[in-house]
Amino acid sequence: MLSPKRTKFRKAHKGRIHGLAKSGTQLNFGAFGLKALEPERITARQIEASRRAITRAMKRAGRVWIRIFPDTPVSTKPAEVRMGSGKGNPEYWAARVKPGRILFEIEGVPPEVAKLALSLGAAKLPIKTKFVQRIGDA
């Protein structure tokens, strides 16, 4: 699973995800992509599950690019622990995703296979997404 090798700080504020994505909104590598339509934190496990679904549907042909990286530590407190007494320990890593962000890109497969693969990958994610393709690749 994806996670940073090292970070400046162990824990991060929860924060909110406002506005639209400024960068990472265009297809840069592949011919087809999956674009986020909602703001959400996507965990490293969800990214990996989606990647596996996409590569399986493509029958190992073509190439997949992951355009998001889980760089935010998410901390939780254990079950049945009283409020207070500090912030919990980091449990997993998540990527903050804004609407308009390209999540995955693929190439080297026909458009029908690409659409099927990305829809199977989208089913593993907690947000609404949209299939996009490069203009001229019909």
From Swiss-Prot:
<comment type="subunit">
    <text>Part of the 50S ribosomal subunit.</text>
</comment>
<dbReference type="InterPro" id="IPR047873">
    <property type="entry name" value="Ribosomal_uL16"/>
</dbReference>
<dbReference type="GO" id="GO:0022625">
    <property type="term" value="C:cytosolic large ribosomal subunit"/>
</dbReference>
<dbReference type="InterPro" id="IPR036920">
    <property type="entry name" value="Ribosomal_uL16_sf"/>
</dbReference>
<dbReference type="InterPro" id="IPR016180">
    <property type="entry name" value="Ribosomal_uL16_dom"/>
</dbReference>
<dbReference type="GO" id="GO:0000049">
    <property type="term" value="F:tRNA binding"/>
</dbReference>
<keyword id="KW-0689">Ribosomal protein</keyword>
<keyword id="KW-0699">rRNA-binding</keyword>
<dbReference type="GO" id="GO:0019843">
    <property type="term" value="F:rRNA binding"/>
</dbReference>
<dbReference type="InterPro" id="IPR000114">
    <property type="entry name" value="Ribosomal_uL16_bact-type"/>
</dbReference>
<dbReference type="InterPro" id="IPR020798">
    <property type="entry name" value="Ribosomal_uL16_CS"/>
</dbReference>
<dbReference type="Pfam" id="PF00252">
    <property type="entry name" value="Ribosomal_L16"/>
</dbReference>
<protein>
    <recommendedName>
        <fullName>Large ribosomal subunit protein uL16</fullName>
    </recommendedName>
</protein>
<keyword id="KW-0694">RNA-binding</keyword>
<comment type="function">
    <text>Binds 23S rRNA and is also seen to make contacts with the A and possibly P site tRNAs.</text>
</comment>
<keyword id="KW-0687">Ribonucleoprotein</keyword>
<comment type="similarity">
    <text>Belongs to the universal ribosomal protein uL16 family.</text>
</comment>
<dbReference type="GO" id="GO:0003735">
    <property type="term" value="F:structural constituent of ribosome"/>
</dbReference>
<dbReference type="GO" id="GO:0006412">
    <property type="term" value="P:translation"/>
</dbReference>
<keyword id="KW-0820">tRNA-binding</keyword>
